[in-house]
Amino acid sequence: VLTGQSVQSIFQGNDYWKVETNHETFSCQKLIMTTGSNPKIWEMLSEIGHSIVSPVPSLFTFNIKDNRIAALMGISAFANVKVKNTKLEASGPLLITHWGMSGPGILRLSAWGAKILAEKKYQFTIQVNWLNDSTFEETLDLLKDLKLEHSKKIISKKSPFEFPNRLWESLT
C-alpha cells in the first residue's frame, strides 16, 4: 500500500498498462482501478475508452413520513423487507428511528438497490413482514386461530409473536 501518491496519467499499451503517479511510474499486465468518486480519474479512464456509470448514494436509511411508526421510535425487531414492484428483498434486524427505518436489512436494500431506488427518485413503497418467513395467508390463518383460542382476551395486551409488545400494540 502506497500513500501520498496521486495518479497523473494512465496509458494502455497492447499487453500492458502504465500508471504514472506524482512520485513514480508503474507498469503491469493487468490493472484494477478503484477510483471512488474521483472525477479526475474518471476523466482519465474516459480518455482511454472506458465509460463511467453515474454514481448514486448507497448505504442509507429509509426516510418514512408515516404517523403509524412515529410512536415506535427505538423499536428493533427482525423483519423481512421488500421494495414493492422490484425484486429487492432483505431480512435482518430492523430499527425504527426518528425519521424512518434503518438496520442491516434496510442498509442492504439501499446498497444492492442503489440504482433502482435512485431511478425511482427515492419514492417507493416497502412491505415489512414482521413474521419473516410466513406468507400473508399463513399469517392470516395464524391470527384467525389466535382469535378463536383467545376470544375473551384483549389481543393488544400481549404479543403472541417474538417481537416487542409496543410493536404488537401498534399493529393491533
What are the roles of these predicted feature ranges?
Residues 7, 19, 24-38, 44-46, ...:
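Short hydrophobic core segments
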Residues 20, 82-172:
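Residue-level recognition of phosphate/Mg2+-coordinating polar/acidic sites
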